Amino acid sequence: MLFKSFLEKIKTTLSRLSPARRIFLSFALVILLGSLLLSLPFVQATTSQATYFDHLFTTVSMVCVTGLFTQPVASTYNIWGQLICMLLIQIGGLGLMTFIGIFYIQGKQKLSLRGRETIQESFSYGETQSLKDFIHSIFLTTFLVEGIGAFLLSFRFIPEFGWGRGVLTSIFLAVSAFCNAGFDNFGSTSLLAFQTDPLINLVIAGLIITGGLGFMVWFDLATQFGKKKKRRLRFHTKLVLFLTAGILLFGTVSTLLIEWNNPGTIGNLSAPEKLLVSFFQTVSMRTAGFASIDYTQARPVTLFIYILQMFLGGAPGGTAGGLKITTFFVLLVFARSELLGLPHANVARRTIEPRTVQKSFSVFIIFLLTFLLGLILLGITAEGNPRFIYLMFETISALATVGVTANLTPELGKIALSIVMLLMFIGRIGPLTLLVSVAEYQPDKKDTIHYMKADITIG
């Protein structure tokens, strides 16, 4: 009853806001409450040395499903604190409004139009008729995949840590991996201790890929089962699957070739182990943030390729961050049509709508400018004159909600860490959503007037 009353108050507070502002405020609210919960004395481990700023940074990173931290989870929070961490990651991955939506659906109450719009905005879901089924699909997919992942991981962690810690670790990692959060409850070395373990690496990689594909893809795939007459997969689904496979192949091969003889990363491993680590790192770099190599030992060109992968991110409508692979694909198709002098952006016997192209350009420009501004600010405020490639790595890791670091996060001061927090928050809700929520621009009559065409020379 208390939780239901709390949800009712949230609904009342957010009912008059636009979808963009509701997304903005819902994440801000969860971050505030989460930081206060993690600050409570009874959730602290006996070895904890964290301040409120550390709890706030951790909460922002968890709700924004990033993975950066100033204090390790294992040495900072006891079992109760780690359960709160899992809840924050889960809410961050799915969104507070989605949780509110499922409570209303389960209670057989009608979800308001603004609530539907907010959930659609959160997951870039354009259809309205099957929104209820879509929300059910989100939760079913999430808990089913996380459950299977935790079950498989338990075969390794229960013998390693015993029943209590083994089960907790399995569930924690499954939730973190599916939500592309990159957090673990081992310590500060991520998965380096399990670098060549095929079970752990492949299960976590599978969870990351599943979450990164986006719920629209899984909803589309799920509708193929249980029907006598199969309908064709949506073009979006086919595109995401194709692009994901291509990026994973490119990243794996490039890491394998560049780092093959590097003893600081994979040089001392066997050929199958090199392939496993290269594949896992490529999967993780897209938006998850689990580390199985020391990035300070990687070659600069490898880090640059990782930066590009983080910039592109995963698919829209899921737990992944970054620019989004479909956005980049639209830009490539448009560039091709311009080079060939074609009147429309065509691909696979389909025409991309001009509005989609315009939105893709807007997202790309805003994302790029946010990255550059964050890089400049982080370079100004970072202490110790770190390498430029590490600053780029840290900046895009935060903005794309990946969560990897070349050991730079623990060395940053509070001003620089505040910039990292802001980048994580912007990256999670989306730069475009942030601008819309802040500006809430309403066009006036002047914007409907068609003026003389401006003749501007470009290129």
Q: Each predicted region: which residue ranges?
A:
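Membrane-proximal intracellular helices of multi-pass ion channels
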Residues: 1-459
